[in-house]
């Protein structure tokens, strides 16, 4: 099949996971469209080159703040349309939970939205302090998470300062503290209750919903809260009903089921006399990381409009059936707002090609196991390929055991490997996925016969969910996409850890154990993009092997196309050492002592001292200069 632009899109499933923000251009470059498909197209290789010319280094995180604004606009538009279709008059507010990505360049861009259609959520005291500064005057702030008196006091101060803070009661003991602190400060609190739904969305994040969820009140506890408030001056303060169905909900039916249960809570609380003005449905809106449009954990089988409709319809029907005032619908869809806006770019530093295998020449003292392997290779065109592979596996294992027992030497051990790889390649050439019986062996061979692409980044720092929960992220070369990839490879990071490897890849609307990649060219960079990393990854990233934050740039759309609006340097080695307790003055003193003790000339001592200082203050990652 002739390679083409369309085939590039299909190979990497780009059109399905990109959601209109990324595509391949005629030059074979990945391009970003921060304003959606009808807006400006920006070449990612050109952006990286411009950032490097300005001093940035790879690995490099690219942020596109215009995507944040566009995602927020699409979310709001979907609910406007759904409310119009269902004749729902309650209104809608998109709340951003800053735990998803607390960086000022993310939360601040979203918070710059003016109007009732946007709010912020905090789940800790530090997040609350940030949100109190970010929110517009009169803006909605949802205060979630476990709380002490200081947290509660700060939230109440926000209300005194003109912010619409709502303290969501997550456990019964919080209510007493809220009422006591409100009385002390002389302010009527904004209150909410988080109800714990029995409905449970399937997937990796299912524990955030359901009866066993970490947060939320049981039906009895909800009644107890209302019992305390009823008949007091605080009864009218209970305005928010909050719940959470899960995160990254893959199946739209789980959303419908959760909303049916949650709507019953709204109806019952209203019938008891609570003035619920806001129903906060929490998160759950997923991202199709896989591009499979399925119920798989890292995919979704619905679109944005379907999500909005499944949220609005049950509430619209309940309000009509029970003659209730429609509450304002609130969502906390942070993943859907932020995932697309960030792309990590990293360069391949080296490739370890899978052995092609060869047939060694005969020798007089050849062990029987080597002869058997040679015979198998000679029968590739005479016997069923699958049977030959099974026999090769048997004798390969026999050869390894013989080597371990000292029965064969290293030379013959290497010959066994050479023959096994030659047989494996020969078997794979003779199998087809069209034949159902071939698929298990073909899948095994495709997993075994892959190159290792060593990439200048850390899985644990930049895409930690790959290691932690087997999260899927689309990975695509950002250039040479007008050429057919001729190799299959796995991505390995720089860390001294076998878990620093990506094990699953998006390919042809499914998942595979390897990725189609290109052969490296001497003196030419080969750069790979890790897409949809804007939610959680920066915040969850750790410092395994002392690899810290990468360099980052913000790329903004302007009248000429784009501009690099802001550049942030990543962590340097001295910063990482200081973080784990090293006294840098002492480190430098030890270096100086050892240089003096080595008895070198003044010039050599100065040169070594300068190199040590450069290493101490340099970027922890490898040089991004192409291999010669």
Curated annotation (Swiss-Prot):
One of its Pfam families is: Arg_decarb_HB
Residues annotated as binding substrate = 279-289
Q: Which reaction does it catalyse?
A: L-arginine + H(+) = agmatine + CO2
Residue stretches spanning the membrane? none
EC number(s): the record gives: 4.1.1.19
Molecular-function GO terms, alphabetical: arginine decarboxylase activity; metal ion binding
**Span of the secretion signal?**
none
| Cofactor(s) the protein needs | Mg(2+); pyridoxal 5'-phosphate
User: Metal-binding: is it a keyword of this entry?
Assistant: yes
Enumerate the Gene Ontology biological process terms. arginine catabolic process; putrescine biosynthetic process from arginine; spermidine biosynthetic process
User: What cystine pairs are annotated?
Assistant: none
Tell me the domain of life.
Bacteria
Positions where N6-(pyridoxal phosphate)lysine occurs in the chain: 99
KW Magnesium (keyword) present: yes
Q: What class of enzyme is it?
A: lyase
Pathway note:
Amine and polyamine biosynthesis; agmatine biosynthesis; agmatine from L-arginine: step 1/1
Alphabetized, the UniProt keywords read: Decarboxylase, Lyase, Magnesium, Metal-binding, Polyamine biosynthesis, Pyridoxal phosphate, Spermidine biosynthesis
Family from the record: Belongs to the Orn/Lys/Arg decarboxylase class-II family. SpeA subfamily.
Q: What does the protein in this record do?
A: Catalyzes the biosynthesis of agmatine from arginine.
Under what name is this protein listed? Biosynthetic arginine decarboxylase
- Which source organism does the UniProt entry give? Xylella fastidiosa (strain M12)
Q: What gene makes this protein?
A: speA
């Amino acid at each position: 099949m002739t390679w083409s632009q369309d085939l590039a899109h299909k190979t990497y499933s780009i059109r399905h996971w990109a959601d209109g923000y990324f595509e391949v251009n005629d030059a074979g470059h990945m391009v970003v469209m921060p304003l959606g498909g009808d807006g400006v197209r920006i070449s990612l290789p050109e952006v990286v080159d411009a950032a490097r010319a300005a001093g940035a280094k790879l690995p490099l995180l690219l942020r596109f703040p215009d995507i944040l604004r566009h995602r927020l606009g699409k979310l709001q538009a979907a609910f406007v349309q759904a409310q119009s279709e269902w004749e729902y008059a309650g209104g809608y507010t998109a709340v951003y939970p800053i735990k998803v990505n607390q960086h000022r360049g993310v939360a601040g861009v979203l918070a710059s939205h003016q109007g009732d259609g946007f709010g912020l959520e905090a789940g800790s005291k530090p997040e609350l302090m940030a949100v109190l500064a970010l929110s517009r005057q009169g803006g909605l702030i949802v205060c979630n998470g476990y709380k002490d008196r200081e947290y509660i006091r700060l939230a109440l101060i926000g209300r005194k300062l003109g912010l619409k803070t709502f303290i969501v009661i997550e456990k019964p003991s919080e209510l007493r503290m809220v009422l006591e602190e409100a009385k002390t400060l002389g302010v009527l609190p904004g209150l909410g209750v988080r109800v714990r739904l029995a409905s449970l969305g399937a997937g990796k994040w299912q524990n955030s919903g359901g009866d066993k969820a970490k947060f939320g009140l049981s039906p009895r506890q909800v009644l107890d809260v209302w019992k305390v408030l009823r008949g007091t001056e605080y009864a009218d303060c209970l305005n928010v009903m909050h719940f959470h169905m899960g995160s990254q909900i893959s199946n739209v039916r789980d959303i419908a089921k959760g909303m049916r249960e949650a709507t019953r809570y709204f109806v019952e609380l209203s019938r008891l006399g609570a003035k619920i003005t806001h129903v906060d449905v929490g998160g759950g809106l997923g991202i199709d990381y896989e591009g499979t449009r399925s119920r798989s954990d890292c995919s979704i089988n619905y679109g944005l409009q379907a999500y909005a409709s499944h949220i609005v319809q049950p509430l619209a029907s309940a309000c009509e059936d029970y003659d209730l005032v429609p509450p304002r619908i609130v969502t906390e869809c942070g993943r859907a707002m932020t995932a697309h806006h960030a792309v990590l770019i990293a360069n391949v530093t080296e490739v370890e090609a899978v052995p092609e295998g060869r047939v060694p020449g005969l020798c007089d003292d050849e062990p029987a196991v080597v002869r058997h392997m040679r015979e198998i290779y000679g029968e590739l065109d005479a016997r069923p390929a699958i049977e030959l592979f099974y026999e090769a596996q048997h004798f390969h294992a026999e050869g390894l055991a013989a080597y371990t027992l000292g029965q064969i030497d290293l030379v013959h051990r290497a010959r066994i490997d050479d023959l096994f790889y030659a047989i494996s390649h020969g078997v794979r050439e003779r199998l087809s996925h069209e034949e159902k019986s071939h698929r298990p062996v073909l899948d095994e061979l495709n997993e075994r016969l892959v190159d290792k692409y060593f990439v200048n980044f850390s899985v644990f720092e930049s895409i930690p969910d790959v290691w932690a929960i087997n999260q899927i992220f689309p990975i695509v070369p950002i250039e040479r996409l007008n050429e057919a990839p001729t190799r299959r490879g796995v991505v390995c990071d720089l860390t001294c850890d076998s878990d620093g490897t990506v094990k699953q890849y998006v390919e042809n609307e499914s998942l595979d154990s390897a990725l189609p990649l290109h052969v490296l060219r001497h003196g030419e960079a080969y750069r790979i993009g890790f897409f949809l990393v804007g939610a959680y990854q920066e915040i969850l990233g750790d410092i395994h092997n002392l690899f810290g934050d990468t360099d980052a740039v913000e790329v903004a759309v302007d009248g000429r196309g784009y501009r690099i609006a802001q550049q942030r340097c990543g962590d340097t080695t001295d910063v990482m050492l200081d973080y784990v307790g090293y006294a840098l003055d002492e480190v430098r003193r030890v270096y100086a002592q050892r240089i003096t003790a080595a008895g070198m000339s003044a010039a050599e001592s100065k040169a070594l001292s300068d190199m040590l200082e450069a290493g101490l203050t340099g970027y922890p990652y490898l040089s991004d200069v192409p291999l010669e």
